[in-house]
Amino acid sequence: MIVNTFQIDKSNGERLDIYLVEKLHPISRSKIKTYIKGSSILVNGDKVKPGYILQKGDFVKVKIKDNIQNNIPILPEKMKIDVLYEDDYVIAVNKPSGLVVHPGVKNNAGTLVNGLVYHFDRLSDINGDLSRGIVHRLDADTSGIILAAKTNEAHLWLSKQFKERTVKKTYVSITWGKWEEKNGVIKGWISRRKSDPTTFTFSNISENGKYSKTNYSVDKQYQNFAKVLFYPVTGRTHQIRVHSSFIGNPIFGDEKYGGGVKKGKEYKPELYKYFSNQLGKFGRHALHAFSIEFELFKSGGKRIKLDAPIPEDFVDLEESLLGHES
C-alpha cells in the first residue's frame, strides 16, 4: 500500500498524471491514469481527470495498493558498497556508474537498494520498499555520492534540507566545446517532454515547468572540451544535463541531451572518428557527484562535507582528450 499526500507549491501548468510519474516512480503513467480514474488518487478530496492541471495549494492524496511494489521482492544482494560515511542515522555511498539506484519493473536485482538491504539492518521505508533508504537519486550512468537514511525520522530530516536547498552539492563534468564565461548561472524552467516523458526540456517562460538553477565554474578549458564544476541550487531530474545542453555545451557522452555521437559530427572527419572512439570506450555520460555538504541528524547543527574520488575512467577520459589536443 502506498499512502502519501503532496501539496503543490507552485502552479506551472503541469498535468496531474505527469506530475505523479516522478513522484510514484517506477509506476507507469498508464497505471497512474488508471488509479486516477478509479479515485485512488484525489485532488483536494475530489475525483479529477488525469489531465487535470495542478494549481498552487492543491493537495494530491494517493492511496493505492500497487502490484508493482507487491510483486517485486527486495532481495538482499552481496555487492561491494563504497561507504564514505556512516553513523546511527545516515549512510553516504560512492555509487559507481552503471549501477541503478532502486529496483523497477525491468530490473528487480543488482541495484543499490539490493546492496544496501544486504549490508544494513535498518533502512527507511518512507518511500516504499523499492526505495528503501534512498533520500535522493542519481542517474544510473552518473557516479558519485548518494545519501541513504536508516530511519524514517532521519529520512524526513534530510529531505527537508534538500527541499529548503541547504544541501550543497558539487558535480564534476566533461562537456563539449568552449564556454563563453568562466563562471555563471543557468536558470529557467524544466518540464517533461510530452513526446518522451523520460526526457526534459528547458524554457525561459515561468509557466512551463519547475524552476531550476545551477551555478557553474569552468575548471579547465581546452580546445574542444572543458572540465566544468556544477553547483545545483535546485534538484530537478536531469537538471545539470538539461542546463548544459541548453547553453550549447552538452555533457560528453550524454546521448539523450545532444552530447553523444551526433555532436562529434560537428567536427572535422579525423576528430569525429577520434571522438566516436572515445565515446564508445567511455560508454556513459561524463558526470560525477563529487561532493555534498549537509547537517547531520541529531548533531546540534553540525554540518559535514564529504567527497567522492573522481573515478578512474573519468580521469582516463580527460587525459586522453587532453593528450589528443597537445
Range-by-range predicted roles:
Residues 1-31, 79-81, 220, 233, ...:
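Pseudouridine synthases involved in rRNA/tRNA modification
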Residues 64-66, 196-199, 211, 271-277:
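Short Pro/Gly-enriched beta-strand edge/turn motifs at strand-loop
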Residues 73-78, 204-214, 286-287:
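Short coil-to-beta-strand transition motifs
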Residues 1-194, 301, 310-322:
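RNA pseudouridine synthases
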Residues 158, 236-244:
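Short beta-strand segments enriched for Tyr within beta-sheet-rich domains
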Residues 45-47, 223, 228-231:
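Short histidine-centered loop motifs in beta-beta connectors
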Residues 180-181, 195, 220-224, 297:
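Short, conserved beta-turn/loop elements at beta-strand boundaries and strand-helix junctions
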